[in-house]
Regions:
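Ser/Thr-glycine-rich phosphate-binding loops at phosphate-binding pockets of nucleotides
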Residues: 1, 238
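Nucleotide/phosphate-binding catalytic cleft detector across ATP-hydrolyzing
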Residues: 3-232
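Short glycine-aspartate micro-motif
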Residues: 233-237
Length: 238
């Protein structure tokens, strides 16, 4: 009840993410209908998806304390499950180990805008030679972003260019990379689970569940046009 600010009812169904999530969603709606004695006319239909545990993601940056940390924040903020983080120049074994872990997505950063160019180009070449099979978001030095993307795309890798996660020293700009991660989530993860079909039944574009939690936390902290926020807060997502 948006006017009263209350949760009226809840329904649930077993997960069917390994087959078709529409089956589980229909079961949850049937459970809700049983509890309420009928389904109401919904003003809004909104959804999020955990994608069977979230996006398995690896980040590669220039310096661990700087661009690698910025890449890590972008990954976690988008609802990704960070399974590895690398800094400095990748060795052949590093790149092969990344490929062997079969991440869903890789965020490649490195260098401020106009700063170090060599490392991100080097790392792109090593990843290309290791035959990385997942999409790569290039979010490093904008001066060589196109060249970096060309190295990867010439190896058959799906590449997206985003704004630099650290355009200036100690200045973070992670939101564009987060948006790119979410786009990959929608395009490559949820389509495999039948969520693209389910999306037609909702008003809003699907997003990763952890990203929805973060948006909710941001709303709580900052408030809306009509309601003030709570201010600084800590959210524990269990």
């Amino acid at each position: 009840d948006l006017i009263g600010g209350q949760i009226i009812a809840a329904g649930q169904g077993p997960s069917t993410v390994t087959t078709d999530i529409n089956i589980g969603m229909d079961a949850a709606l049937a459970d809700l209908e049983k509890r309420m004695g009928g389904l109401p006319d919904f003003d809004h239909r909104l959804a999020s998806s955990s994608a069977a545990g979230g996006l398995a993601m690896i980040t590669v940056g220039l310096v661990k304390e700087l661009t690698a940390e910025a890449a890590r924040q972008a990954a976690l903020g988008a609802g990704a499950k960070l399974i590895g983080a690398h800094a400095y120049k990748l060795t052949v074994k590093d790149a092969e180990a990344i490929t062997a872990r079969q991440p869903d997505i890789l965020l490649l950063a490195g260098g401020t805008d106009g700063g170090n160019e060599e490392t991100i180009l080097w790392n792109a070449q090593k990843l290309a030679e290791a035959q990385l099979a997942c999409p790569v978001i290039v979010a490093g030095n904008r001066v060589v972003a196109d060249d970096t993307a060309d190295i990867l795309s010439n190896a058959g890798i799906d590449v997206r260019i985003s704004d630099n996660v650290m355009p200036e020293f100690n200045v973070l700009n992670v939101e564009p990379a987060r948006a790119a991660i979410r786009n990959v989530f929608i395009e490559r993860i949820v389509h495999a689970k039948g969520i693209d079909k389910a999306a037609k039944r909702f008003d809003a574009v699907l997003m990763p569940t952890p990203a929805a939690v973060m948006d909710g936390a941001k709303l709580l902290a900052e408030g809306s046009d009509t309601t003030p926020g709570l201010g600084n807060l800590i959210i524990v997502d269990v």
